[in-house]
């Protein structure tokens, strides 16, 4: 009975599971029936989320064109704390580069990694003193067309970035890529096509659950094998229109929409 369910398209309450025929087994899967809207950005902040990150305790939310500002969501109480430290804002803007707008963030021990929305720089901030310690500058493609870093994850050894290139005459397999980065050199040591989504939409989400990468684009959630870049499974979350951030806290995926909404998807 289970195999029959996995080999068919399951659609319940506006949610769909799209199985990959190459998949042999699934390790642990989200409980898609329990997807829940849990928070909205505070009204005093621009309602445009660019990325999410989990710091080991709470969920961090960065703002698109927010000049380094961010907010922290308490997972237990769902209360917000809005950043008011200019040193933090300055460091984020410095690493994000063009237009001072982060497109992806993730925590790696005592480092906060930031990728610019316009793909011109990425690097990390030492969270002990909030200095922009390392910045890797330069676009991934030497091309005048717009590019963007739109989601970051740390797997314990490497940084992963969801990258978008606004060359719409090319197939998405060339313009939407998952980049594997050596954190010491900033060099790309692996490249895989991202699951397809809206060609001209740079909003993404990317995170690591200890075994797999998770990627969100539009309404489509994908789990990805980091060794091969193969999509293991996909879930269509109809309630989410324009995902812009993804974070894993050990129990659930937190999903941001560009319009300021925060969703929680338990496993």
PLM segments and residue spans:
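Bacterial Sec-dependent signal peptides at the C-terminal "C-region" and cleavage site
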Residues: 2-28
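A short beta-strand motif characteristic of beta-propeller blades
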Residues: 36-43, 80-96, 131-143, 187-197, ...
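Beta-rich, blade/repeat-based domains predominating
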Residues: 44-55, 96-108, 140-156, 162-165, ...
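A short loop-to-beta-strand structural motif that recurs across blades of beta-propeller domains
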Residues: 69-74, 120-124, 176-179, 220-222, ...
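Blade-level signature of beta-propeller repeat domains, shared across WD40, Kelch, NHL, RCC1
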Residues: 242-267
């Amino acid at each position: 009975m289970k195999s029959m369910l996995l080999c068919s398209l399951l659609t319940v309450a506006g949610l769909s599971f799209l199985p990959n025929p190459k998949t042999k087994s699934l390790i642990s899967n989200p409980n898609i029936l329990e997807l829940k809207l849990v928070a909205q950005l505070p009204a005093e902040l621009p309602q445009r989320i660019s990325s999410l990150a989990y710091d080991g305790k709470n969920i961090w939310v960065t703002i698109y064109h927010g000049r380094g500002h961010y907010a922290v969501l308490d997972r237990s109480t769902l209360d917000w704390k809005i950043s008011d430290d200019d040193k933090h804002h300055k460091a984020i803007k410095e690493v994000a580069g063009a237009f001072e707008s982060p497109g992806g963030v993730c925590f790696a021990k005592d480092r906060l990694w930031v990728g610019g929305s316009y793909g011109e720089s990425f690097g990390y901030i030492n969270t002990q003193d909030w200095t922009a310690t390392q910045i890797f500058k330069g676009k991934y493609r030497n091309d005048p067309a717009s590019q963007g870093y739109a989601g970051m994850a740390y797997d314990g050894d490497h940084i992963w970035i969801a990258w978008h290139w606004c060359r719409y005459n090319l197939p998405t397999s060339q313009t939407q890529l998952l980049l594997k980065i050596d954190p010491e050199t900033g060099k790309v040591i692996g490249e895989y096509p991202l699951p397809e989504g809206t060609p001209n939409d740079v909003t993404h989400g990317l995170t690591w659950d200890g075994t797999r990468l998770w990627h969100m684009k539009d309404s489509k959630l994908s789990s990805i094998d980091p060794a091969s870049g193969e999509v293991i499974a996909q879930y269509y979350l109809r309630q989410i229109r324009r995902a812009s951030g993804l974070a894993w806290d050990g129990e659930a995926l937190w999903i941001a929409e560009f319009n300021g909404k925060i969703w929680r998807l338990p496993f």
